[in-house]
């Protein structure tokens, strides 16, 4: 059966574009030993439309789909409900990596692209640990994230945090404290939540 597609709709192009943005974030999270690739299946001879940390495999944008990946694509297209696969492999330099291939679906739920992740298993432990350990003083070190069960709890927590920030700042006059609290909540996007004005 011929499962090939020849052209993407504008909506499907936007879908692929959104995955390209996700590729950057995922690669940054896992570090330089994680390769992330987006394939456009309308052009198998130049299917790689996005690649982050391509130095790991030596590939770049415009590279063709690999034989192994193409084989998995055919299996996914022929098997209902199969939309991802994870496996272990080696590159041409003999370096082992764990790979994941996930289908990117189009408007008619057909596979239009692939979201692929390759994590190299020869990554030194120190390098791996440094990826998840702040080395320099950054803004992210000071972020405290609280997970909540509902948006009301989220809003109330945000309100308490804003109050603490404002009340501890002695340069803010008493008459401006409420204004500053509202300003902080606005900057955090709290007022985009339903019923935020009533709750706050």
Across the structure, where does each feature detected by a protein language model lie?
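Short loop/turn and capping residues at structural boundaries
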Residues: 38, 101, 196-197
